[in-house]
C-alpha cells in the first residue's frame, strides 16, 4: 500500500475517542482464565512444531520508581534480588526449553522493569543460559529495553559483545520540569552519547519511547522534545498516550490531576507529533508507532505483511512467542498463556512445578478467524476477503454480517472504504483503527467491559 498521510478530523476523533482494546492479542488478556492449564499449553506447543521461536524474558526490577509507570515492576536497590530471580528463571528455562527442541530462535527480547538493572555478570549468566538451552539463528534479532539513567557506555559494549543488536530506550520527555514531576530526571547529553555509541558499535536498530499526557506537558514543551528526538534520529519511535489510572497504579497517585494537560491539549500534542514526525520523514505505522521508510516495519506494512504481538509490531508473524519470567505472556499455537503476576507466587510455582503458568485461553475457530481479521486491519490498514475466505472456508459477507452492520456507520463517516473485495482504512481512519477493529470483537458485544481499556487517543 502507498504511504498515507494522516487526515486529522477533530470532530471524528472526538466522536470516536472512547475506551477500547489495543489488540496486542485477540481475544484480549481480559478473557484469560485460570481454567487454562499446563496440559492445554503442552497441546498447543505440539500443534505447530515447525514454527520458529521468539523469546521474551521479563526482568521486573527498577532502581527508581517512575510515577507514570503501569508496568509489572519491583523497585529495589538490593542487587542480590536479581540473583534470586535468575535462579528461578534458570529453573523455568531448563524446564520449558526441551518442549521446543529442534526449533530455531529468530528473536529474543528483554523487557521490564529495567533489564539493564542486571549487572554485567548477571547479563552474561542469563545470555549463557538462553544460548545453552535454545538454538539461535545466526541472524537472530536480539533486543533490550534500556533506561538511560541505569546504564553506562561500557555496559552497552558488554551487551553488544553478548549478541544484542537492537536497542529500545525510554526517554519519555526531554523537558526537565516534566521529568522531575514523574521522578525520571535524566542527562540529555548522555542520551545522545548512548545512541551514537550504540550505532558505532553495531546496533542495527534503535527505538525511542516517548509519552504524551504527562504533568506540565504542553504542545509547546513537547515540540521541544520532538525537535531533540529528530536530532537523535532513531530508526523507530513509540509515542504512547499516558493513561492516568491512580486507583489501579499506586505510583500514579503522586501525580496531581491539576498538573495534567487537558484532553484538548493532549489532542493538540498528538496532532503536532504526527505532523512533525511525518514531515521529518517517518512513516506512521499505526497506533503510537513510527518508523523510517527504509525500516523493515515500514517496508513490511507497505507490502501488507506486518504483524503484531504482545511485544508490538513485528515482521515475524509466523513465530511462536514464549514468554519467561514473572507476568510474561506466551502466544503458542492457538493459545495465549500468562505466568504468575506476583513474584512470590512465581517463585513458589517454579520451585514446585518448574513452570509459572497462571492463566490463559485456548482459541476457538471463531477466535482464530477474528484474530486474522483484526491483525490485518491493525497492521496493514486493509483487509482482503479472499485469503480469509480461502483459509477458513467461509463467505465473508455472510459470516461477518453483524460485524459489517456495526462497521457501516464508520464507513459513512469516512473511516473505511468497504466493497465486495475487502476493507480499506482511509487516512481519516488510521488514527481510529482500534474503533474499526472493535466492530469485529465479539467479546465486546457480549459484555459491557469497555471501561477496562484505555481511550483510543
Curated annotation (Swiss-Prot):
GO molecular-function term, one example from the UniProt record: coproporphyrinogen dehydrogenase activity
Transmembrane segments: none
Top-rank taxon: Bacteria
Reported regulation of activity: Inhibited by EDTA.
Keywords noted in UniProt: 4Fe-4S, Cytoplasm, Iron, Iron-sulfur, Metal-binding, Oxidoreductase, Porphyrin biosynthesis, S-adenosyl-L-methionine
Result after altering residue 311 to A: Loss of activity. No change in iron content. Can cleave up to one molecule of S-adenosyl-L-methionine (in vitro)
EC number from the UniProt entry: 1.3.98.3
Outcome reported for the amino acid change (mutating residue 56 to A/L): Loss of activity
One cellular-component annotation, GO: cytoplasm
Enzyme class: oxidoreductase
Cell compartment(s), UniProt: Cytoplasm
Cofactor requirements of the protein: [4Fe-4S] cluster
Catalysed transformations (reactions): coproporphyrinogen III + 2 S-adenosyl-L-methionine = protoporphyrinogen IX + 2 5'-deoxyadenosine + 2 L-methionine + 2 CO2
Coiled-coil region(s): none
A Gene Ontology biological process term: protoporphyrinogen IX biosynthetic process from glutamate
Binding-site list for [4Fe-4S] cluster: 62, 66, 69
Effect of residue 69 to S: Results in loss of iron-sulfur cluster and activity
PROSITE patterns: RADICAL_SAM
Stated consequence of mutating residue 71 to S: No effect on iron-sulfur cluster, but results in activity loss
Record's function text: Involved in the heme biosynthesis. Catalyzes the anaerobic oxidative decarboxylation of propionate groups of rings A and B of coproporphyrinogen III to yield the vinyl groups in protoporphyrinogen IX. It can use NAD or NADP, but NAD is preferred.
Family: Belongs to the anaerobic coproporphyrinogen-III oxidase family.
Quaternary structure and partners: Monomer.
Protein name per UniProt: Oxygen-independent coproporphyrinogen III oxidase
Organism lineage string: Bacteria, Pseudomonadati, Pseudomonadota, Gammaproteobacteria, Enterobacterales
Amino acid at each position: 500500500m502507498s504511504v498515507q498521510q494522516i487526515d486529522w478530523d477533530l470532530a471524528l476523533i472526538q466522536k470516536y475517542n472512547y475506551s477500547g482494546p489495543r489488540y496486542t492479542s485477540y481475544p484480549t488478556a481480559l478473557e484469560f482464565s485460570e481454567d487454562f492449564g499446563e496440559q492445554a499449553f503442552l497441546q498447543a506447543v505440539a500443534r505447530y512444531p515447525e514454527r520458529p521461536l521468539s523469546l521474551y524474558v521479563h526482568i521486573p526490577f527498577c532502581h527508581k520508581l517512575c510515577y507514570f509507570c503501569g508496568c509489572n515492576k519491583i523497585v529495589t536497590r538490593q542487587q542480590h534480588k536479581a540473583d534470586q530471580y535468575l535462579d528461578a528463571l534458570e529453573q523455568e528455562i531448563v524446564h520449558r526449553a526441551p518442549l521446543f527442541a529442534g526449533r530455531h530462535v529468530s528473536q529474543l527480547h528483554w523487557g521490564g522493569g529495567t533489564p539493564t538493572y542486571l549487572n554485567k555478570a548477571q547479563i552474561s549468566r542469563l545470555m549463557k543460559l538462553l544460548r545453552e538451552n535454545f538454538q539461535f539463528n545466526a541472524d537472530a534479532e536480539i533486543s533490550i529495553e534500556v533506561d538511560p539513567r541505569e546504564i553506562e557506555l561500557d555496559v552497552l559494549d558488554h551487551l553488544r559483545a553478548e549478541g544484542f543488536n537492537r536497542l529500545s530506550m525510554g526517554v519519555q520527555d526531554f523537558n526537565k520540569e516534566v521529568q522531575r514531576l514523574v521522578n525520571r530526571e535524566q542527562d540529555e547529553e548522555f542520551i545522545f552519547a548512548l545512541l551514537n555509541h550504540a550505532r558505532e558499535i553495531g546496533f542495527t536498530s534503535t527505538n525511542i519511547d516517548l509519552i504524551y499526557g504527562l504533568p506540565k506537558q504542553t504542545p509547546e514543551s513537547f515540540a521541544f522534545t520532538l525537535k531533540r528526538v529528530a536530532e537523535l534520529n532513531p530508526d523507530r519511535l513509540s509515542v504512547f498516550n499516558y493513561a492516568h489510572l491512580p486507583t489501579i497504579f499506586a505510583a500514579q497517585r503522586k501525580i496531581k490531576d491539576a498538573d495534567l494537560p487537558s484532553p484538548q491539549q493532549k489532542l493538540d500534542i498528538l496532532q503536532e507529533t504526527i505532523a512533525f514526525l511525518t514531515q521529518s520523514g517517518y512513516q506512521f505505522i499505526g497506533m503510537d508507532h513510527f518508523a523510517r521508510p527504509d525500516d523493515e516495519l515500514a517496508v513490511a506494512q507497505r507490502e501488507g505483511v506486518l504483524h503484531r504481538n504482545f511485544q508490538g509490531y513485528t515482521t515475524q508473524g509466523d513465530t511462536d512467542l514464549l514468554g519467561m519470567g514473572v507476568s510474561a505472556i506466551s502466544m503458542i499455537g492457538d493459545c495465549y498463556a500468562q505466568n504468575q503476576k506476583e513474584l512470590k507466587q512465581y517463585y513458589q510455582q517454579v520451585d514446585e512445578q518448574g513452570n509459572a503458568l497462571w492463566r490463559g485461553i485456548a482459541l476457538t475457530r471463531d477466535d482464530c478467524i477474528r484474530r486474522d481479521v483484526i491483525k490485518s486491519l491493525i497492521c496493514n490498514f486493509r483487509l482482503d476477503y479472499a485469503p480469509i475466505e480461502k483459509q477458513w472456508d467461509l463467505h465473508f459477507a455472510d459470516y461477518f454480517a453483524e460485524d459489517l452492520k456495526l462497521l457501516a456507520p464508520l464507513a459513512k463517516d469516512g473511516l473505511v472504504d468497504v466493497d465486495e473485495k475487502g476493507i480499506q482504512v482511509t487516512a481519516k481512519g488510521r488514527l481510529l483503527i482500534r474503533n474499526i477493529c472493535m466492530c469485529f470483537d465479539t467479546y465486546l458485544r457480549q459484555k459491557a467491559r469497555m471501561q477496562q481499556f484505555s481511550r483510543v487517543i
